[in-house]
Amino acid sequence: MLVLARRTNESIMIGDDIEIVIVDIKGDQVKIGVKAPRDVSVHRAEVYKDIQEENKKAAETKIKPADLGKIGNILKKKDSGKKE
């Protein structure tokens, strides 16, 4: 792990297009800003772990083929009711 010392308003670059800015330091809390392209996901570690767990649960969910047919029929009915 790379460890860097930074002060308020100083930043760190990751690659060519991600910048981490130290916004504020108060006591034992450091506020950071992340400047990154919109296609780059940025999450706090604890939120990211929750997202991974939910994705894992969703992938393990068993869907019966008959249920897929029902969902397809509902979507077809919904689409046929739209005006173009």
Curated annotation (Swiss-Prot):
Pfam families per record: CsrA
Localisation per UniProt entry: Cytoplasm
Organism: Leptospira interrogans serogroup Icterohaemorrhagiae serovar Lai (strain 56601)
Gene this chain is encoded by: csrA
GO molecular function, one term: mRNA 5'-UTR binding
Disulfide bonds: none
Keywords tagged on the record: Bacterial flagellum biogenesis, Cytoplasm, Repressor, RNA-binding, Translation regulation
InterPro entries documented for this protein: CsrA (IPR003751), CsrA_sf (IPR036107)
Family listed: Belongs to the CsrA/RsmA family.
One GO-annotated biological process of the protein: bacterial-type flagellum organization
Subunit structure: Homodimer; the beta-strands of each monomer intercalate to form a hydrophobic core, while the alpha-helices form wings that extend away from the core.
PANTHER family per record: CARBON STORAGE REGULATOR (PTHR34984:SF1)
Its biological purpose: A translational regulator that binds mRNA to regulate translation initiation and/or mRNA stability. Usually binds in the 5'-UTR at or near the Shine-Dalgarno sequence preventing ribosome-binding, thus repressing translation. Its main target seems to be the major flagellin gene, while its function is anatagonized by FliW.
Name this protein carries in UniProt: Translational regulator CsrA
Domain of life of the native organism: Bacteria
Cellular component terms (Gene Ontology): cytosol
